[in-house]
Amino acid sequence: MQKENKLPVDDMWQWKGGAKFSNTVAVGDQVFISGQQTLDKDGVVLNPGDIAAQTRNVFENMKSSLVGLNMGLDDLVRLNTYYVFEGDDKDATTFWEDMTRVRLEYFPDPGPAATAVRAKGMPYEGQLIQIEGVALRGESRRCRQRIMPEGSWDWSIAVPLSQGWKIGNRIFVGGQISADKTGRPVHVGDLDAQTRNIYEYIGRVLSDAGASFSDLTRVKICFKYDSKDPNSGQAFVDRIMEVSKEYIKGTPPVVTAFAVDLLYPGLDLELDAMAIVDQDTKALAPNELGGRYQPSEFSDGVLADGEIYIGGQTATEPDGSVMFPGDFSAQANEVFQRLDRVLQEADATLKDIVKLNLFIVGQDAQVEEFFHQACRVWTEVSPNSYPAMTPVRVHELPKPGLLFQADCIAIK
């Protein structure tokens, strides 16, 4: 399918060092929007430490990107926000509410399905927020259906965001948390109950859209960092994936998991999801791909209605040990090679990627260089390939020693 890649031009924000990725990629009725940064044309951070100013910067950048395609923020069906807050958990909700009051200046009504999580950081010191999204155009945009199930949770302040959107046979499920209609966490201290509660919310979105768990193509697991069961010692992320297996009903979805902090104190996880209703959905399972952190019940990739979703790839041996410990570039190369091998199962290549997500683990002084290393490795592995891209610094990945993870969406 023909793609329209828009690279930054003129005075648009840019990464340092000439790293090139598309600001937007339009394909068919969808527009994939890169993580929008609070940077200038030389990659210098604007308004460092000022969350209100930075929030306006990234929304203005997203708005400008859409205007260039004769679109607007009201065309968004998905919006992901990664933000940084290093204060006490008890102050995190107030910080989010203050940030969101600025976001409310830009949210359309009805708004997109949205996920917002507290990341460890961004590629450059002083960055506090980035946003990415998916927008719809044409007949699909006109015929979209908002999904707001009865009995779902709600936010602690009034926002016009949506629990989900149905566009044809696609269902965008926004971030789900274990909360009630006032935004108050429920099942605090019970990871299994929180996880099942969230899947119940996801199930309601799917049901109201005429779909079911058998139509899931991707699940994103944002888990509380540095968390283990105090009795068994099992990592929260491993237990979340075990419970998630209860909801596999058809072709297994792909999974990407990474550690964050959560919106409200007492929450252990947030999940969002993508579903596509297609009776010919196919799991992609390359031979000898290597090890992974996801249970074998999940797919490496899923092909549904011409769209390819690849779960989080890491440099993991078949025995679960980490490859190339301490060597970020080697891990990044392995990860990108694995993306390519999964794509080959669908007769696709890295050049078919429309959205690439990078998850980086590193110390404060390392992260900027790690990000630029990932960009250089990408250019070596897939020259002249410019997908939309979002890089996030996360607290940790599912296995200690992993420094890098990537997942992607591709359309042939």
Feature-to-residue mapping (PLM):
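N-terminal presequence-like segments and the immediate start of the first folded domain
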Residues: 1-60, 64-77, 83-217, 223-337, ...
